[in-house]
Regions:
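Interfaces that engage single-stranded nucleic acids at replication/repair/recombination sites
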Residues: 202
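Flexible interhelical linker loops that connect adjacent transmembrane helices
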Residues: 55-64, 181-189
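Membrane-water interface of transmembrane alpha-helices
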Residues: 43-55
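C-terminal transmembrane helix-loop-helix hairpin of multi-pass membrane proteins
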Residues: 1-45, 65-100, 104-178, 187-199, ...
Length: 323
């Protein structure tokens, strides 16, 4: 029952984000983004239905028991949160540099708990004004950590899942403590070209490191994010942030996305959703991963749907020839 509840919570969170994007696009009269988001929402539902068979098997399986390793996982995630928050705000590294550095350290020194630490690092990217109380970060970490443990067998192999859980934790914590997330101005259209360029480069590079060089997903994402942040003149620039978002899409398993063409499509979709969500949920941790998660899940649904349409067209063509 708890596993089912966590699944429903994740789905409702995803739909809430897409609904917020739709409302923002309507207010800004952006018809193109409105159509893309609507299609993404439909594809998300399609993909969820496809995942339901695996999820039912998880729900019917043995319930998760409180083991020492789970306590270590929650501790690792919380540690990643506070370390990144410290590097981000007290040292002044900025969110991308801090998170990617923590991710690399985790992948190399604490491989077993690298995913949990990296998930926590996204919470640590949250705004210090909204999460000024250390206990609010702890609350966000506990919520995200619980979701991390309960959803370990859900949506396996999709990019952005870690950030999506971090977003669910920070958004829930901000609502509980009464410090709502902010809404800012939409992304300037003058930045569209650079944003999409770096999104494609970062997404494809991360996927390449996984597929061609057999590097684990956390290392691939953190390494690409760190390199771009160090090479760009301003490590906190929106272009760097967008590129970091794309690295999470690039964390998608090569078993899920089998070709570079499919990854290119997911990278472009990530860029579109990044633009659509830019003004929303400012100050939250995990927002970038949530965008990537929606892009990879809904994008996979689009790819699967297109394959089904092609199969049906081929069958109808074969039947017409046989007649």
């Amino acid at each position: 029952m708890i596993t089912l509840a966590s699944f429903i919570f994740l789905i409702l969170t995803a739909l809430f984000i897409l609904q917020s994007m739709l409302s923002s696009s309507i207010q800004n009269l952006n018809i193109f983004l409105l159509a893309i988001i609507a299609l993404s929402a439909l594809s998300l539902l399609f993909q969820i239905r496809a995942e339901w068979t695996d999820i039912k098997r998880v729900i019917k399986g043995k319930a998760i028991s409180l083991e020492r390793s789970l306590v270590y996982t929650l501790t690792a995630l919380t540690g990643g949160t506070y370390l990144t928050f410290f590097l981000n705000h007290s040292i002044g590294m900025g969110g991308v540099l801090a998170s990617s550095a923590v991710g690399l350290i985790a992948a190399w020194a604490f491989k077993k708990y690298a995913a949990a630490i990296y998930c926590g690092s996204f919470i640590g990217m949250a705004c210090s004004i909204i999460f000024s109380n250390p206990l609010s970060l702890l609350l966000a970490s506990i919520i995200s950590g619980t979701l991390f443990i309960l959803s370990s067998n859900m949506f396996v192999g999709f990019g952005g899942k870690l950030g999506f859980m971090a977003f669910a934790g920070t958004y829930s914590a901000s609502a509980i403590i009464g410090t709502p997330l902010r809404t800012i101005d939409p992304l300037s259209r003058n930045l569209y070209f650079l944003v999409f360029l770096f999104v494609i480069i970062a997404g494809m590079a991360t996927y390449f490191l996984q597929k061609a060089l057999d590097i684990d997903a956390v290392t691939a994402s953190a390494l690409v994010g760190l390199v771009i942040a160090l090479l760009f003149p301003d490590a906190t620039h929106v272009v760097v942030v967008a590129a970091f978002c794309a690295t999470f899409a690039g964390m998608v398993s090569p078993d899920r996305v089998t070709t570079y063409r499919q990854m290119l499509f997911l990278s472009i979709l990530t860029g579109m959703l990044f633009v659509a969500a830019f003004s929303l949920f400012d100050g939250s941790g995990g927002k970038l991963g949530a965008i990537a998660f929606l892009a990879t899940v809904s994008g996979s649904g689009m790819i699967t749907g297109l394959k089904l349409i092609r199969k049906r067209l081929n069958r109808s063509t074969e039947k017409s020839y046989s007649i």
